[in-house]
């Protein structure tokens, strides 16, 4: 049985820019069942790495936040490292990408894709 918990707005912030980009990508895929899953794995030069993928399912214990009609979903293990973080979408000279501003990260690598706590 699937259970999903709605996050308080302050738990993890899903920025308007990120939500709009996710909405655009879902429209391009023509699959309204998709949501953005954010997760943390071991690895990277600082110990932990962020990951993003599109998913159609919710897993036991997932938490989610909605913005612009789309869902951001986080598993229970990743959630503990993302409390207070902002998931954003940025387009600049380095390219276009989803990024996480994480107040729990003590150090980050130069590219910003890994961190330590």
From Swiss-Prot:
Instruction: Quote the PROSITE patterns the UniProt record gives.
Output: HESB (PS01152)
Known role: Required for insertion of 4Fe-4S clusters for at least IspG.
Cofactor(s) needed by this chain:
iron-sulfur cluster
Q: Which PANTHER family does the UniProt entry name for this protein?
A: IRON-SULFUR CLUSTER ASSEMBLY 2 HOMOLOG, MITOCHONDRIAL (PTHR43011:SF1)
State whether keyword Metal-binding applies: yes
Q: Which UniProt keywords apply?
A: Iron, Iron-sulfur, Metal-binding
Q: Which HAMAP family match?
A: Fe_S_insert_ErpA
Describe the subunit structure. Answer: Homodimer.
Q: Which Pfam families match?
A: Fe-S_biosyn
Among InterPro entries, the record links this protein to: FeS_biogenesis, FeS_cluster_insertion, FeS_cluster_insertion_CS, FeS_cluster_insertion_RrpA, HesB-like_dom_sf
Please report the name of this protein according to its UniProt entry.
Iron-sulfur cluster insertion protein ErpA
**GO biological process terms, semicolon-separated:** iron-sulfur cluster assembly
Annotated source species: Ruthia magnifica subsp. Calyptogena magnifica
Q: Which GO terms describe its molecular function?
A: 2 iron, 2 sulfur cluster binding; 4 iron, 4 sulfur cluster binding; iron ion binding
Family per record? Belongs to the HesB/IscA family.
Question: Record's SUPFAM superfamilies?
Answer: HesB-like domain
Q: Which domain of life is it from?
A: Bacteria
The residues that hold iron-sulfur cluster are 45, 109, 111
Q: What does the Swiss-Prot or TrEMBL cofactor note state?
A: Binds 1 iron-sulfur cluster per subunit.
